[in-house]
Amino acid sequence: GTNDILQGRDSTYVYKTLVKAIELASTKGTVIIGLETQIDSDMDGLDLVVREVNEQLKAYAEAHNIKVIDFYTTLFEADQIGQIVFAGEVHPNERGYRLMAYKALEVFTRL
């Protein structure tokens, strides 16, 4: 998703592509959707596209009774209190990945 956004694709395109992947994965078993992470510096307003995709994914997940791991909010909140969670514009650093792992574990333990 994020790579498509960085290449200038809009939220509708990214969402439809991700839904195709979700539907394919669901034929193999339980699916959990991990929301896209923020784009750290909001390059050219691209973080807005990430947020739009995530809102669409949340609605899809709710309609299809699929669990969601909200990686976006996890990293956004850490970033807002001054934690350095990115190793560049898009990829989390060690702390960011650790926070994401904790969030995933929180969701997995409630299955």
Predicted regions and their residues:
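Catalytic His-Asp segment of secreted/periplasmic serine-dependent ester chemistry enzymes
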Residues: 38-111
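Charged helix-capping and loop-helix junction motifs
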Residues: 11-19, 49-54
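Active-site segments of SGNH/GDSL-like serine hydrolases
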Residues: 2-6, 21-52
